[in-house]
């Protein structure tokens, strides 16, 4: 449990609870996602503290790309989970996240790279990801700017795309609040003191 004495806070302009079960520090997309997932798991005593306003750190200028193709199968599965989650938070929060599914292609200019893409595809299929090995000519139909003569193959991910990181963060925040989470903005944490019992 958090005790008020264990955090030094500055800029506190709102009445805040003095004890809580968990505190998330930082109101970017990751912090708001953590708060959302805690409330989704049933944590009703969870608080997020943001030193300024939500998304005021690096989230507001993030690219917002969505990808499932990754060399690490665990990361690929996490990326797939997150893409599926976006619809959920949009529905719960009522916040449009500006999601655009465009599809994406990874190209192989060498046989070695193409073999690597085949391995990534096989791992992805095992994890339930819907990717497809395609020819350079098929890739050109999707991306007319490429010259198929320079490539030996490609990997297509139909659900790749992009979204608005600002709106996505607010969707997480609104969904978390609807599930009992609390968010305090303009609260700077300047010190943490760990109790001997942890």
Please describe what each predicted stretch is:
Residues 6-20:
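A short, basic/flexible loop-to-alpha-helix module at the beginning of a structural domain
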Residues 16-30, 47:
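Beta1/beta-strand and adjacent pyrophosphate-binding region of the FAD-binding site
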Residues 35, 39, 175:
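Gly/Ala-rich phosphate-binding loop of Rossmann-like dinucleotide-binding domains
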Residues 39-59:
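Glycine-rich FAD pyrophosphate-binding loop
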Residues 50, 135, 185-187:
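Short loop/edge segments at beta-strand edges and connector loops
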Residues 64-142:
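Dinucleotide-binding Rossmann-like beta1-alpha1 core, especially the glycine-rich loop
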Residues 157-198:
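Helical element adjacent to the flavin cofactor pocket in flavoenzyme catalytic cores
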